[in-house]
Amino acid sequence: MNTKSAMITICGRPNVGKSTLTNFLVGEKIAIVSNKPQTTRNRICGIVTRDNTQFVFVDTPGYHRARTKLGDYMVNTVRESIADVDLTLLVVEPIASIGPQEEGLIEKIRASHCPAVLVINKIDTVEKDTLLEVIARYSQAYSFEDILPISAKTGDGVEELLRVCGKYAQEGPFLFPDDVTTDQPERQVMAEIIREKLLWCLDKEIPHGTAVEITKFSERDNGIIDIDATIYCEKASHKGIIIGKQGAMLKKISSMARVDCEKFMGTQVFLTTWVKVKENWRDSDFLVKNFGYRD
């Protein structure tokens, strides 16, 4: 049986549902999600193998105007991910106006000479007339190979999206073993799970100023996994909020994270967390790279 594979970048502004779409395509949670912008910081590969075809979906950070060294890294990650792939999926919301982020991404796609499909997400939230207006507006802006309305939340249209992606697969060996669903190391997945809980449990700027480092990841003879994690924040006042009164907030975050860590690992996990301050780490090239945000 001849095998085929396709590298497919998923890009868009923050909070359009790129990670939700990636998770739905893969069939399991490999990318963290939250209701806050800039949830995704790294490029994450979600791998889907169907019969003789393997799709490698590259979930990217939301495209935005960078204001920190970390932001620069995230924006550069998007730019680099659009180049040299088989297909780019531009994910947008069903809003008639085209924003500056979408305009910027269309220019990046045009410069890459890469085939592109427009994916209009969240169609479960709009009327048909609005959807038709969105399609017309984007059709004038760029010659997309296809325009596909979907709902990553309900799965409506996702199977058709996968079928369209199959047209861009190239003959050759699979890029990953057929039982693999992500290229992320387990330590990175654990760190991202903890960061997701920070995003859900904390307000305003505090979670955006956090980073998570896994300092211990070991498996006992009985299969139980011990994980030590350090949560870094930018201010001493933020540290107090993360820990909470008598440690209540940190306990809540850790408990929620442990449940998802166990789901991913398929075994019991003992998770221990600490909180430390690294002032303005997002504007330090050294610390941004030290926390795993590197090319």
Question: Positions of the model-derived regions?
Answer:
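Canonical P-loop GTPase G-domain recognition
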Residues: 115, 124-182, 186
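Active-site glycine-centered loops adjacent to acidic/histidine catalytic or metal-binding residues
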Residues: 59, 121, 151
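Conserved C-terminal guanine-recognition region of P-loop GTPase G domains, centered on the G4
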Residues: 49, 76-147, 218-221
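P-loop NTP-binding site
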Residues: 186-295
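Catalytic P-loop NTPase motifs of RecA-like helicase/translocase cores
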Residues: 40, 64-65, 97-98, 126-127, ...
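Conserved glycine(s) of the Walker
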Residues: 17, 157, 249
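Conserved, well-folded catalytic cores of nucleic-acid-processing
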Residues: 28, 47-51, 66, 81, ...
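Conserved G1/Walker A P-loop phosphate-binding module
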Residues: 1-76, 80-83
